[in-house]
């Protein structure tokens, strides 16, 4: 081996050690707490908002409150559109501590605050033929859940987490809290909700082999 090659190999080893060290150091840094974020609720410890990992299909979406609208379509007696303020001011608010489990193996327990999804959907007068609720997001993501599940589990559409308005990276203006389902059902940046009877509908990850049921076993 020539002296030149030995020097190159030595430099590569040093660079590798430096990058590994940086990675270990960054993993051990304390995670930033959002100003005003609560870490405990009624005796239960909560995860940090920054404990979430970024795994959206196109990165965090920036949606303006002033131009946002949520449309309810499909098997309803009337298509209806809500502004952000209309949802915030018209519907009863609920809180619940729920854990999101990701298929990647991590989980977070958060205090969510929002609105019963069923109450929002009923404003459009749900047709008796409706069986499935399909959700569409600003970034092109979609997923679906049975209407009975949404009713029976009292699923909420969250606008706050740990007492703070959802930050853009966590789904502002609204994130679905699909408790007992894996994280890919917890759709963020929702812009349209469609009532359907298409039991075979599959969303973004479901068409790529993920379970359409997504129940945590």
Regions found by a protein language model. Name each.
Residues 60-108:
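A glycine-rich, hydrophobic loop/mini-helix early in the fold
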Residues 74-76, 86, 104-106, 114, ...:
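A mature extracytoplasmic/lumenal domain signature
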Residues 2-70, 123-217:
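Extended, aromatic/histidine-rich regions of cofactor-dependent oxidoreductases associated
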Residues 2, 81-83, 116, 146:
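Helix N-cap and loop-to-helix transition residues
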Residues 77, 108, 117, 174, ...:
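Short, flexible micro-motifs
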Residues 68, 80, 113-116, 120, ...:
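Stable alpha-helical elements in mature extracytoplasmic
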Residues 92-145:
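Mid-length scaffold segments of soluble, non-membrane domains
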């Amino acid at each position: 081996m020539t002296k030149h090659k030995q020097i190159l190999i030595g430099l590569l080893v040093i660079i590798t050690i430096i990058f590994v060290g940086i990675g270990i150091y960054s993993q051990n840094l304390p995670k930033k707490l959002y100003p005003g974020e609560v870490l405990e609720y009624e005796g239960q410890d909560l995860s940090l908002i920054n404990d979430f990992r970024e795994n959206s299909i196109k990165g965090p979406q920036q949606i303006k409150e002033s131009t946002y609208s949520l449309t309810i379509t499909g098997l309803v007696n009337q298509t209806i559109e809500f502004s952000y303020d209309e949802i915030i001011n018209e519907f009863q608010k609920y809180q619940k501590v729920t854990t999101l489990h990701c298929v990647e193996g991590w989980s977070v327990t958060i205090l969510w605050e929002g609105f019963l999804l069923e109450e929002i959907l009923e404003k459009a007068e749900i047709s008796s033929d409706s069986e499935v609720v399909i959700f569409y997001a600003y970034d092109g993501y979609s997923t679906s859940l049975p209407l009975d599940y949404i009713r029976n589990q009292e699923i909420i559409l969250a606008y706050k987490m740990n007492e703070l308005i959802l930050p853009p990276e966590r789904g502002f203006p609204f994130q679905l809290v699909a408790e007992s389902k894996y994280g890919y059902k917890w759709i963020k940046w929702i812009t349209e909700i469609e009532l359907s009877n298409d039991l075979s509908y599959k969303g973004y990850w479901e068409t790529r082999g993920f379970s359409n049921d997504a129940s945590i076993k």
